[in-house]
Curated annotation (Swiss-Prot):
Its EC number is 2.7.1.-, 2.7.1.59. It comes from Shewanella sp. (strain ANA-3). Keywords: ATP-binding, Carbohydrate metabolism, Cytoplasm, Kinase, Metal-binding, Nucleotide-binding, Transferase, Zinc. Its main location: cytoplasm. ATP binds at residues 4-11, 132-139. This is N-acetylgalactosamine kinase AgaK. It comes from the Bacteria. GO terms for biological process: N-acetylglucosamine metabolic process. The gene is agaK.
Length: 308
């Protein structure tokens, strides 16, 4: 059996897959994000529970928020206790088995490239538009991670100067410590903040969407601004990576208005003659991360380092 664990800021999901990568069972529990010892004990306990249920020792793959460096050290995670820790190495010592680990957005991309809507395409770019923004690039079914495992952290690219000037955008401070990261505008949190600044009132993404569908002028202005920012980011990714397909996940990807406007918004920032990639919704949605983690444990992606 193959186990995938998707670690979030508030929850941990463990899923069990058979040898054909068909889902057999899954469950969730709270993330003990402040105490590393409690976190590791929780993971070990849940994996042993899965072993007992399956009657065998399954392979283990972990998807988590943050950058996993080449030596397995986790940095820039929103789960505080994981930063500067070698999670896979430490868990492997507890379990006495190999543990694979990767960034959750990269696992999303891998899942969709190998098993999902990106299957059959050579160059698959996965992109999450949710609480945060990030993704991953798969080439012929393998993750491209880069020299420092940073490939896919495009949420921390700066917003282009022409877009910032055109809309007189405020410089939002990102959780990474920088200002003006694309994530601070195109994530769900960023869109809500953008609407608050334009409308001059406290509101969230849900309030914005309701107002947009009622043809509120300020909501429409927010939408146009948002699509210009997102289109510029997408165009930069098209120029840098030239994917066959861009697979979208996260809550904002399910907003019909955004998905419908995205190709034209991207094209507006590209020179004439450029062929756009296909834009498609993920097949597995929020389950892509845990499925991608199982793929790491399965050993189908040789680009990930394993800790034994």
């Amino acid at each position: 059996m193959y186990y995938g664990l998707d670690i979030g800021g508030t929850k941990i999901e463990l899923a069990i897959f058979d040898t054909q990568l068909a889902l057999q069972d899954k469950w969730r529990l709270s993330t003990p994000g402040q105490d590393y010892s409690a976190f590791m004990a929780t993971l070990a306990e849940q994996i042993e529970k899965a072993d007992q249920q399956c009657g065998e020792r399954g392979t283990v793959g972990i998807a988590l928020p943050g950058v996993v460096k080449a030596d397995g050290t986790v940095i820039s995670s929103n789960v505080p206790c994981l930063n500067q820790r070698r999670v896979a190495h430490d868990l492997a010592q507890l379990l006495n088995r190999t543990v694979a680990i990767g960034n959750d957005c990269r696992c999303f991309a891998l899942s969709e490239a190998v098993l999902g809507v990106g299957r059959g395409y050579s160059r698959v770019l996965g992109m999450i538009l949710g609480t945060g923004t990030g993704g991953g690039l798969c080439i012929d079914g393998k993750l491209y991670l880069g020299a420092n495992r940073l490939a896919g952290e495009f949420g921390h690219q700066g917003v282009s100067a022409n877009v910032a000037c055109r809309h007189q955008l405020p410089l939002y401070v990102c959780g990474c410590g920088l200002e003006g990261c694309a994530e601070t505008y195109v994530s769900g949190t960023g869109l809500g903040r953008l609407y608050q600044d334009i409308a001059g009132q406290t509101a969230d993404t849900f309030a914005w969407l309701n107002a947009l569908r009622c043809n509120d002028p300020l909501a429409i202005k927010t939408f146009d601004t948002y699509m210009d920012i997102l289109g510029s980011l997408m165009a930069s990714l098209v120029l840098a990576m030239d994917p066959d397909i861009i697979v979208l996940g996260g809550g904002l990807s399910e907003v019909e208005e955004i998905l419908a406007a995205l190709p034209q918004a991207t094209k507006a920032h590209l020179f004439d003659g450029v062929t756009l990639p296909q834009f498609k919704l993920a097949d597995f949605g929020s389950a892509s991360g845990v499925r991608g983690a199982a793929l790491l444990g399965h050993g189908l992606d040789a680009g990930i380092s394993y800790e034994a």
